[in-house]
Regions:
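Active-site-adjacent segment of FAD-dependent monooxygenases/related oxidoreductases
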Residues: 47-52, 56-124
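Conserved mid-domain beta->alpha element of the FAD-binding
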Residues: 19-27, 121, 165, 267, ...
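Glycine-rich FAD pyrophosphate-binding loop
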Residues: 29-51
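Conserved FAD-binding catalytic core of PHBH/FMO-like flavoproteins
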Residues: 123, 162, 166-273
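N-terminal Rossmann-like FAD-binding beta1-loop-alpha1 element of flavoenzymes
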Residues: 10-37
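Core beta-strand elements of the Rossmann-like FAD/NAD(P) dinucleotide-binding domain
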Residues: 10, 153-162
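A conserved short coil-to-beta-strand element within the FAD-binding core of flavoproteins
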Residues: 134-148
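C-terminal helical "tail/cap" subdomain of flavin- and related membrane-associated enzymes
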Residues: 5-6, 321-408
Length: 408
């Protein structure tokens, strides 16, 4: 390795203090390992928008295992809507209301802004003893047979036995290692609008998906509640331009067609994005010292809320693999632990990508017959409820639990 090493070697360095990096830090500390988190942003960073909303039950269970009490804290802050409703062309085709959960049980999910999830994770990681270096943007990575050397923008170097790369979709770590991302980019774009709820006169706590909304030119529109507000997601039509939907002026024009006009003055964030369906060709480097997690390893449509939840599963699996590697009797066993992580989590990511891609193909059909089937299902749903349920479930993609990798 380079002679530029200036710091004592750590067990593990996590690059990135988003939800995946923080989850990795928690899991590593629960394994008894020292961990330092390098984050490019300053400690007082402000994160725009709601970003990832849903923390699912399996993720809550993983977090609670690493930090007992964390699951009820996050779930208690977030909201769980009990009613989901699906419409097509202005007519309801499916609705279901779930019973109240028994006290003390982890909910199927909780909905809150990513910045709120991160706040809980950061506090738990600090209490657990993770060290943080803020304003430490990684610019170079050297991985060798015995350690990894990271160089940050200020010229400082950091050495570790293992590194978890959780530095997001533009991962410097992944790019430095030459690991490619493979997969397609979807057509069109989506516009999301975060809105603060009116505490005196709130909308029903329901998730609604509206195929072909008549008030918005027959575009698909979804409303998802989160703690303190809700998000509107609009799917673009062919020929749409982002400036027609994702500017302040545009939102003020179209938003009253889908929610009461009073919410025009309660918009907190507007964004537009395109869907990628890509997975890293490997979740570990050739030396088996760097493990990729979260968006550093995969990007796919958020249909089914697979993004952050799969990243939390990556983080937990990476921590377990590193703990096994550090306690291994010889380098071959250590490498095998990382290889198992690579194979298992890459297979999970590919399954998630395919499931989200199936949902996206349903929502953006290339063949007219698919749209006709959806409309026929809507017409028949009053007499055959299964058709309405199909329209509801298809927006998430298939649920295919993997016995060795969990749901995500």
């Amino acid at each position: 390795m380079s002679a530029r090493n200036t710091n004592s070697r750590k067990d593990v360095i996590v690059v990135g203090a988003g939800p995946v990096g923080l989850s990795a830090a928690l899991a590593l500390r629960s394994c008894g390992l020292e961990v330092t988190v390098l984050e490019a942003d300053p400690a007082n960073r402000v994160r725009p928008g709601s970003r990832a909303l849903f923390v699912h039950r399996e993720s809550l269970a993983l977090l609670d295992r690493a930090s007992p009490g964390l699951a009820p804290a996050i779930a208690g802050f977030g909201v769980m809507w009990r009613t989901k409703r699906t419409l097509l062309g202005g007519r309801e085709v499916y609705a279901r209301t779930y019973p109240e959960l028994p006290p003390g049980r982890i909910p199927p999910f909780t909905s809150l802004r990513q910045l709120d999830t991160e706040r809980f994770l950061l506090e738990a990681a600090k209490v657990a003893g993770a060290d943080f270096v803020w304003g430490a943007r990684v610019t170079a990575v050297e991985a060798g047979p015995d350690e990894v050397l990271l160089t940050t923008e200020d010229g400082a170097t950091h050495r570790a036995c293992y590194v978890v790369a959780a530095d997001g979709s533009r991962s410097t770590v992944r790019r430095s290692l030459g690991i490619a991302m493979n997969g397609p980019r979807s057509e069109g774009f989506h516009t999301t609008v975060d809105i603060a709820e009116d505490p005196d006169d709130p909308m029903p706590l329901e998730r609604t998906f509206h195929y072909e909304h008549p008030g918005l030119g027959w575009r698909h529109v979804m409303r998802v509640p989160f703690a303190g507000g809700f998000q509107i997601d609009v799917q673009s039509a062919d020929g749409d331009r982002p400036e027609e939907f994702a500017t302040e002026e545009a939102v003020r024009d179209w938003l009253p067609r889908v929610v009461p006009r009073k919410y025009v003055d309660s918009v907190t964030c507007v964004a537009n994005y395109r869907f990628l369906q890509v997975v890293a060709e490997s979740f570990a480097d050739d030396s088996r010292r760097v493990l990729l997690a979260g968006e550093a390893a995969h990007l796919f449509p958020p249909l089914g809320a697979r993004g952050m939840n799969s990243g939390i599963a990556d983080a937990d699996a990476a921590a377990n693999a590193i703990a096994l590697a550090l306690s291994a009797a010889d380098p071959r066993q250590a490498g095998a632990a990382v290889e198992r992580f690579d194979a298992t989590r890459r297979a999970a990511a590919e399954a998630n990508r395919d499931a989200a891609g199936t949902a996206l193909a349903h929502l953006r059909p290339r063949r007219r017959i698919t749209r006709l089937r959806q409309r026929a299902a809507a017409a028949l749903s009053p007499v055959v409820p299964a058709f309405g349920e199909w329209l509801e479930q298809a927006t998430y993609g298939p649920k295919t639990p993997r016995p060795h990798a969990g749901r995500y």
